[in-house]
Amino acid sequence: MTKLKQERGIPMERKNQKSFITTDDRLDKIKLEDASVRDVAEAFYYGNDSYNYNLDVLVSGFFNKSSINKYETNFSKYKHTVLQITMPDFLASLGFQKTGEYNPSHGNKIAKATKESKDIEGIIYQFYDKGLILYNHTQDKNRKLIIEISSWYDKTGYDYSIYCNYDIDNNILLNWENYTKANNPYRGKKIDGSGEILKLNENISFDSIVLPDKMLKIIKDNTLKFFGTTALLSQNNVNLKRGIILSGPPGNGKTMICKALANEVNVSVLYVLPSNLQQTTDVNRIYEMAIELSPCLLIIEDIDFMTMDRDNFSGDGRLIELMNKLDGIEEMNGVITLATTNLVDKVETAIKNRPGRFDRVINIPLPDIDLRIEMFKKFLNNADVDYEVVAEKAEKLSGAYIKEICQTAKLLAIVNGDIDSNNLAIVNDDYLLEAITEMSDKDFSQAKKYIPKNKIGFEVSRIER
């Protein structure tokens, strides 16, 4: 055996085993006669990594069912996916190598393993990627981890199996949580509030947004440049969490800014919609995700739906929870909360313009004539039209409306046969003015009946004629 171990590079001294692994009689349970296979067993026993057993994973009775189900229920798809991805790797990092089988044809899905010629099976309650199966024993009351190295052929052609048992440590779930903090597969990814990968339009960038340069600089300084200088900020005792509110009428580019930032930042992005924050516990869940994924840009659209002024609102536990999170009761270094609202005057005063919560409120007003000219040029690819005239006619219209006017003008050109040799619409002043008149006389005037005067520019669906 010594010679074989030396030939295969197996260390003479046993490596330190994990405290929750029992190994006293491990080799005695391996009934193998052939030296080469026994040597494989010793390599496995001493933790040698030079052998690739190509095993699946079967965990038997690893957690009690209630604890793991409660854990996943509290964290929705996000934690479920993190568990799927990290648990097999976590076990492998501890030296666990396991195999078994499961029978999906059975109504309850039965997992099976073999322990010293005794079949063990249990009802599966979780089945994960990479072959990880969690189930409860039905025939063996001891909480054991069954390890089987199957289909190992020695040079004589015989098939051997190696069986070993581990006692399970009660703290292993906590150890796994610590493991995921360093190996979270979502870190650096762009996800939504339920843990799904975002499908962002990669063409949206700050180059596609028409806003005053000064305003864009403020936004970039508090987001892109902030994430790029965290080490320097920390050295100078600058708070490494930020809260920013983008306010203004609908259609003025708030969501476009959020999407551009999501595309351009090189950190994790968590994009949250009102549907992701229905309960107080959802606020806590979202911020736990952001902290785990930090550095992270947390985008919350339409934050006014849960932060209404308490003088005019009966109260909402979500508001209190949000204030607690922003106050930094928990460490939130590296988390920027970027929120949007069309109704900033309705947002609770204790939230907005409050250092430590939302430090900046950036108002994005309706575009002035210079910005409207720039928008028309951008949306029309510098077509030969009188931009000052059409921009004046589009007074008090948002960027979204101006874009719609340009789309309508192109449609009018196409249906009238005004296209160039490259099949591109030839837009002229008449088409633009007709589009503006069509919108102003019908859709826009109808919209103004149902919205406050200070919300002119509110986006409404085009009225069918």
Language-model regions: role of each:
Residues 62, 175, 179, 222, ...:
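Residues that form generic nucleotide/phosphate-binding pockets
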